[in-house]
């Protein structure tokens, strides 16, 4: 069935999803401009990256519902998604870590940025980076989350360096990390934890540099749950073989 044979409403819906995904390029551009702004507009940078995070969290589901790959087969939204993801999940956060966070002397900070950017390719270029039960296999280059936690929790340089190196290595190790919406096991708990984490994080960004202990505890517990869910899946072993996957959605 050719594209023209689908109802106009279906074609409009499919293109609307593609436009939503492409809007990530706008949010990425605004975030990058805020990062390099002379006044160091880091709050706005995180606002735009959080907007991009929300878009990335829903566009995959909408794409499947709108059957975009079937209705517009010649336009690969998965490639658009990968470009946007690399910018918003990896590149801009890595630059932010170099520019704004205590990451050691400048040469070391630059080396760490290079390690983050290059090691992430083993995630984005990995055709088997997601298991058949929808866990990410290897750290999924979620440097926006790592950098955001460093920022709002105001962690010291030594901690930042050690954690960065650990996650660089974990990108290459077949440990598991839960997709909050697509993993069936603990799905309700996963989604609830994401919502709680997101709201608490937005609050901390808004009131930065304040960091009430109650909000810190909420973030640590909700974020820690995802790490625990991944550990539990890793301990179960290779029950499901990895599957080809082009996007993180």
Residue ranges and their predicted role:
Residues 49-56, 115-123, 167-174, 222-229:
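Alpha-helical transmembrane segments of multi-pass membrane proteins
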Residues 1-5, 136-249:
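C-terminal membrane-associated helical module and adjoining short loops/tails
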Residues 23-34, 55-61, 87-89, 133-141, ...:
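Hydrophobic alpha-helical transmembrane segments
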């Amino acid at each position: 069935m050719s594209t023209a044979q689908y109802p106009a409403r279906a074609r409009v819906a499919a293109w609307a999803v593609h436009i939503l995904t492409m809007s990530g390029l706008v949010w990425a551009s605004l975030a990058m401009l805020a990062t390099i702004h002379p006044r160091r507009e880091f709050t706005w940078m995180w606002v735009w990256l959080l907007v991009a995070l929300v878009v990335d969290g829903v566009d995959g589901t909408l794409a499947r519902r709108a059957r975009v790959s079937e209705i517009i087969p010649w336009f690969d939204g998965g490639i658009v998604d990968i470009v946007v993801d690399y910018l918003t999940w990896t590149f801009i956060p890595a630059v932010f870590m170099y520019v704004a966070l205590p990451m050691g002397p400048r040469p070391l900070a630059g080396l760490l940025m290079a390690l983050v950017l290059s090691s992430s390719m083993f995630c984005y270029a990995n055709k088997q980076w997601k298991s058949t039960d929808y866990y990410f296999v290897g750290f999924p280059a979620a440097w926006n989350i790592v950098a955001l936690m460093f920022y709002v929790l105001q962690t010291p340089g030594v901690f930042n360096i050690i954690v960065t190196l650990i996650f660089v290595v974990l990108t290459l190790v077949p440990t598991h990390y839960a997709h909050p919406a697509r993993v069936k096991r603990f799905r309700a708990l996963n989604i609830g934890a994401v919502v709680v984490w997101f709201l608490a994080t937005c609050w901390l960004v808004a009131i930065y540099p304040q960091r009430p202990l109650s909000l810190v505890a909420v973030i640590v517990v909700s974020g820690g749950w995802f790490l625990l869910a991944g550990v539990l899946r890793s301990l179960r072993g290779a029950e499901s073989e990895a599957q080809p996957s082009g996007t993180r959605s």
